[in-house]
Every structure is written in C-alpha cells, then in structure tokens.
Amino acid sequence: MTDALLPANLNAKRLSEQNYFRKGKSIAQTGRSKLQNQRAILNQQILKAMRMRAGAENLLRATANNKIREQVLLELSFVNSNLQRLKEELERLNISVEVYQHTEQASNIPLIPLGLKETKDVDFTTAFKDFILEHYSEDASEYENELADLMDLRQACRTPSRDEAGVELLVSYFQQLGYLENRFFPPSRNIGILFTWYDSFTGVPVSQPNISLEKASILFNIAALYSQIGTRCNRQTKIGLEEAVTTFQKAAGVLNYLKETFTHTPSYDMSPAMLGALIKMLLAEAHECYFEKMILSGIQNEFCTLLKAAQEAAKVSEVHMQVYTLMNQAPIKENVPYSWSVMVQVKAEHYKALANYFVAITLIDYQLNLSDDEDKQEKAISQLYDSMPEGLTAQTILKDQQQRTLLGKAHLSKAIRSHEEAIRFSTLCSTLRQIDVLQLILSAFHQRSLLKFSQHQKPDDFLDLLSAPDIVSKTEYQAETIPPQLSKDKVTDIFQRLGPLSIFSVKQRWSAPRKMCITKEDGDFGFVLKGDCPVQVISLDPLCPAATEGLKEGDYIVSVAGKDCKWCSTSQVMDMLQETGQDSIEIQVISIQDQTNSLANKSATYYAGMQKTYSLVCLTMDNDKNTKTQKATKKLSFLSWGFKNRQKAASTICLPSEVKGKPKTDMVFSFPDNSLSTESALY
C-alpha cells in the first residue's frame, strides 16, 4: 500500500485510477462468491420472516379475541417453521467446506473456515456533503471524486479476493475508517448514516449509526478471510502446511484483537464468548496442520519417534475436545452451527484414534536391538502415561514381548472404538454425511486399524482383560495468536484535501474561508507565521494593513494567491508570499469556531424487525448540571434491556437511562493523535 505522504498535487488522480481498491471479485466469479450471494439472499429472507414473527407476536398480545388468537397462533407456527428452515439453510452454507479446500486435498479432513459477514449498502454522499459544508465550511461538490472512491472501496470490500491482496483491501478500508471516524463522526451527535451488518451465524441484522460497528465487522471479515486462505492452502506440501499454520494463527490474532478492543459488540458472532470459541477453533486447526506437516513425509519407524507422534496426535485431539466443550456451552450452543460442533467432535475422536494406533504399532512391531538406547526408550514409555497399567513397569514393557503385545492390542482396540465413534458422530449429522472426503478418510483409517488388529488376533483374545490407559498429550508446538499488523502500511487518506487530520477533524469546527489582500509595509507584512500544515498567524501588528483587512491573530492560512497551502510548512508559505515579487497578495484564512455543546443524541443498536431492542450506550454532554450532586444509575446491558421492554411495541426503540455522575471525559470519544485509533466510546 502507499504511504500516507503529502502528494505534490492533491487533485492529480482519483484513488480508483491508481488501482487503490481494484482487488474485489465479482459477486458471480467464484464458487465462494456464489455462496456469499446466497448468504445475502438468505439474510434478507430471514429479516422478512423475523418482521412477520414480530408483527404476529404484537397482534397476539394486543387482541383478546379467541378466534383471532387461534389464526395468529397458526400463522406464527408457519412463520417459525419457515424461519427454522432458513436458519438451517444458513448453517448449510457455513459448513460448505468443500468450496474452500484446495483442489488436490483428497486425503485430508476438511478444515472449517469462517464465512464473511454480509452488509447493506451505505450512502455516504448526503451526510458527508452536509458535514463538509457545515463543519469545514467548504464546497462539498468539490469532493465528489473522494465520495465515489469511498463508496467503491466499501463495495469492493464485500467480495475481497481470497489472497493477501484481499486482506490488504480490507485492512486499507479499516485504516480509512480510522480517518473517517476522526473527520466525520463527532461524539456529540449522529450524522445520519446507519450501518447494517448481518450476523454470520444467525443471519439477524444489526443496525447502528456508529462507525464502530463497521470497524468491528471489517475486523471479523479480515479474520474470516485469513481462515479461508488457510483452508485453501495445499496441505500436501510442507510449504502449504506452514502457510496454513501461520494463516490460522493470524486469523485467531485478528479475532483476539477484536475481542479485546470492542468489548460490548451488538451481534452474537462478535460476542466475547463466541469469539473465544472461534479463536480456540482456529488455533486447533493450526495445531492440526502442524501435526499434518510432522507426518507428511512419513514417520520414521523408530520407537521414540512413533511415541512422539502419538503424543502429538493426542494433543490435537485434546484441543479439539476443548473447542467442542466451548461450543456446547450457552449461549454459544444456540448460535454456532450444529455441524461445526459435530465436526470438531469427529476430529477429537479421529486424532485420539490415531494416537492409540501409533502407540499400538510401536509396541506390537517393536524389536529390541543391542544398539537401542534403553534408557531413552524407558523414559519415553514412562512419559506416555500418567500412571502405568496395573502390574507393569516401563522396563517390563520393554523386556517382555508378550506383555508389550497385549498392551499394544489394547491400544489398537481403543483406536478402533474411537474410529467407530468418529464415524457414528459424522453419520448423525446430515450435513457431514454429504461430505464424501470426510467419510472416505474416516472409513480408510478405520479399516487400517481393523486390518492391523486382525493380523494379531488369536482365538483366546477374549481372555485378555488388559485396558489401555489414556495417552498423555505432549507437543513441541505452541499455538499462539499472531497480532494483526493493521498499521504496518499506511494508506492515503481519501479526504486528505480537507487538510492535516491533526487539525482538520471533528474536534475543531472551522469558519468559512475569508479572502483578503495583504500589503507589505516597509518590506514586512506585519505578522509572524508558526507551525506546519497549516501555518498559523501570530504576533500580528494591530496597525498593519493585514489587520485592517480583517486578519486576526490565531488565523490559519489555507491559500496563497489561489494555491492551496493546508499541507505546506512555514518556510513553504513564506516562499509563496515572497515569490510573487509584489507588495500585495491575496490569501485565504480560516479560524476555529467555538464548539457549542449540545445534548448528545442517544445511540441505540437494534435488530431490525425484532421485538427486542439492544441498547448500548447513551452519551450525554449536559454541562448545565452539577455532576457531583447526581447519583449514578446502573446501566443495563444491551441484552437485559431488550428483555425488560418486552411489553413495548416492536417499533419503539427503547433506551436506558443515561449514565449520570460520570466525569465529562468519560462521556465523549477520545481522539488520540493516532488517526487510526480503534478506541470508541460506543464499544
């Protein structure tokens, strides 16, 4: 991406002409895009069904006529049935893993990618034009190109390419949102722009007039895109598996950043509990790819190496079981796709079976050689279990071929049971039954274990009562999140012509430019300039011609002889004033206007068409009251508030009492010097 440097000509080219965002894919170009298109259609159908259900529930509460109530209840049952069908369709899209896998991956269990969140179109034109005219006192018609670039950039972000270029596109838009937040979104009021995003799992729309929802959703999509890239990596090569491990760690890192930065998100897919489960799932998939890399070229038929592979497989099983446990806790269980939790459970059993299989072939096929390091092998066995089988020691297992074989067959029997459990779980889910690759892999590994068991089966095996203990998981790989590099490559601020962001932001309101002709007197204009980008007038001689023309101390010079100088340094402006060679020159100046604090508009997040209203934060800037004498009112969470107002009409946006007694600094947004700050009072 390009650096955020001052261009020589701010009007030179539109960003679209510089290939700034030509990285989005057409909605019908790829199978993945077709799935995303189907998701958008389903989201609209879910929204319609939820509105119908909300209307029916309102009518049910409003009427006492038994006949009408019976008709409404019948209609409500049809609506709920249709809504359930639509959500099952959405779940089917979420588990359409074949589209995301590499074309040559016919011997790997499919990985689970995250789907991109869908959004509705947003028209920035009217609101931004009004704000430019009102706040910056500039002709908004001169920013048509910038507005068009912004709209095109957002549209391109809806279908990013599944590669690093697509990630760069989303990151660049996220950085632009940081600029936009500081230029156009004052903390004291809403400017009339409503952002709507659909929940990735439930399809429920969430609307909010705050840019923080946009930023959080883009972060979620960056993580989703990383997960899709990781899923697409070629897992038949070492390089492909290493790339998959790194990419899944990056995806988990973005979600972790989202979880820590936006702590009160309005949709279920970005709630802390759900994000925690998704992070665990992505790291489990990274661990899975690491294990596949470890056994890619085959496992050396060596005692300690095989036991090490067994413990690595046990670790993969363990992390997937942890993910399964998280996915079966409320409220995650109600929102995560059922097929996802079953897939995770299948993987947990599958890798548990692999761990027992590796131990089994190690014990059964092992032959003691004089060159073997017995101490090392004995240590490996002692670290394999928390407690040794009854009556056995590590040395006994090494020395006694019969006991070693019996223990190996016990592990083999345990592997077969785990394979059968994995197959049973996969057949219980209709969606997983249709994934042919998964069924073939599970069946092949099951048959391999059965074949190995049959080779060592004897008629009196039913007398062997030895039970294989659980394998202690152990790994040399630590699956950790990789923090996102969201500010690594600075992008060009689309609205940089408004001026440097440190000065021309929502924090300062500017007067309209004032034209004046200043004249030298005794070779001097009668004032001093300071600062850079833009320069400020100080030490103004009240008797000089410039003061007579209306120049005031503290004014900022934005134009000299018709040339924009908002981005010019003091020396550059001085050169512009002197280079004309004339005693008089025309300049334009602006001054900061007093900020009039008014009561901030209350901002509510709500689910369109739903009876519940999810209110987040009410901002206030009431300076007339003494905050020391006010009592703090407990602020309700956005979920509890919706339940409290069940009896109110669906069309009413319910807002909690404003938080009193807080310092003024806690009630407004903070805008640090970094224009890409993701801090937001709403989140």
From Swiss-Prot:
* Cellular compartments per GO CC: perinuclear region of cytoplasm
Give every PDZ domain span: 515-592
Q: Does the keyword Oxidoreductase apply?
A: no
Q: Which family would the database say this protein is a member of?
A: Belongs to the RHPN family.
Query: Which domain of life, per UniProt?
Result: Eukaryota
Its function? Binds specifically to GTP-Rho.
The record's annotation in PANTHER family points to:
RHOPHILIN (PTHR23031), RHOPHILIN-2-RELATED (PTHR23031:SF5)
The BRO1 domain sits at: 110-501
Q: Name one GO biological process term.
A: signal transduction
Kindly give the PROSITE patterns that the UniProt entry links to this protein.
Answer: BRO1, PDZ, REM_1
Compartments, record wording: Cytoplasm, Perinuclear region
Assembly, in brief, is: Interacts with RhoA.
Lipid biosynthesis in keyword set = no
Major location category of this protein: cytoplasm
Its keywords, alphabetically, are:
Coiled coil, Cytoplasm
Note one Pfam family from the annotation. Answer: HR1
Output this protein's name: Rhophilin-2-B
According to the entry, every stretch annotated as the REM-1 domain falls at 25-99
Quote the InterPro entries the UniProt record gives.
BRO1_dom, BRO1_sf, HR1_rho-bd, HR1_rpt_sf, PDZ, PDZ_sf, RHPN1_2, RHPN2_BRO1
